[in-house]
A protein has these predicted regions:
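Rossmann-like NAD(P)(H) cofactor-binding subdomain of soluble oxidoreductases
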Residues: 1-66
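Internal alpha-helical scaffold of NAD(P)-dependent oxidoreductase catalytic cores
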Residues: 20-21, 43-49, 66-166
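Glycine-rich beta-alpha junction loops
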Residues: 35, 55-59, 81, 104-108, ...
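NAD(P)-dependent Rossmann-like dehydrogenase/reductase catalytic/cofactor-binding core
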Residues: 92, 143, 147-150, 154-269
Length: 269
């Protein structure tokens, strides 16, 4: 078995390199974030070569080849592949807290829901997730962003499922609660859920990487919304703004520590 855990923007190039060896490739367990990687792998290598997976544990990178497990939550494996149950068993033998899921897409979209939180907002505004949630108006923006994703999931007939160590259904429920009730709970989760790291979009943008997964996460919400006639204005503005910053079409200082500017852009969209 091969393990596929790349950033989504690296997937196309990686698959181009693997295509000539498709008939020799073993099944691929895909742990990448987003909802487009497994279909791309299936198209390049064959439907029988891909196993849908997800990781909820928090991992930190201290240097090249040096990683640390910051918080053990677990691994999700979708049923449907001949190796799914055996793989789940072996992962549990390794104490990785693996769990099988009936529906691959519900599992992947539920994981993506958790990846959306404070991710582009943190990068665009150069603020921590905790700082984003501490701002009442930004918190409202985060909730609306999540509601859009949930509406898109519902339109596709997908279910929100809890993932290992990650109560995703509680996150979905929080979008229906009064802000005064949900905000303290999610604010604490936002500050601790990623271990000691800044959100991934912030890391990529402020390291000058020149690429962002926002097109594969929030952008995926926008594209699915267009397909299923579900409005996604917040996700659209966040995607377009972060892409523009990543491509250096606008300077980082344009929105840095200026939440009112981002909020105004969303309201005027």
């Amino acid at each position: 078995m091969a393990l596929f855990a790349l950033k989504s923007f690296d997937t196309p190039a990686a698959l181009e390199g693997l295509k000539p060896f498709a008939d020799k490739m073993p099944p691929v367990l895909c742990l990448s974030n987003g909802v487009s990687n497994e279909p791309a792998i299936a198209e390049a290598l064959g439907n029988d070569k891909v196993i849908y997976g997800t990781v909820t544990s928090a991992i930190g990178r201290r240097g090249a080849g040096d990683i640390v497990l910051e918080r053990l939550r677990g691994v999700g494996i979708a049923k449907g592949h001949v190796l799914s149950e055996k793989l789940n068993k072996e992962l549990n033998h390794a104490y990785l807290n693996s769990q099988l899921f009936e529906d691959a897409n519900s599992m992947k979209w539920s994981k993506m829901l958790t990846n959306l939180i404070a991710n582009p907002t943190s990068a665009i505004l150069d603020m921590t997730a905790g700082e984003v949630f501490a701002n009442k108006d930004l918190y409202k923006l985060e909730m609306e962003m999540l509601r859009e994703c949930l509406a898109v999931m519902e339109a596709q007939g997908l279910e929100v499922v809890n993932l290992p160590g990650t109560p995703v259904r509680a996150l979905a429920l929080a979008t229906k609660l009064p802000l005064w009730l949900s905000r303290p709970l999610l604010g604490r989760a936002a500050g601790t859920g990623r271990g000691g790291k800044m959100p991934s979009f912030h890391i990529d943008l402020h390291s000058g990487r020149g690429q962002s997964e926002v097109e594969y996460l929030h952008g995926a919400v926008v594209r699915a919304g267009e397909e299923f006639n579900v409005p996604t204005p917040v996700n659209k503005v966040l995607t377009e703004t972060l892409v523009a910053l990543t491509n250096k079409e606008i300077p980082l200082e344009e929105f840095a520590h200026k939440p009112e500017k981002l909020l105004s852009k969303v309201q005027n969209n």
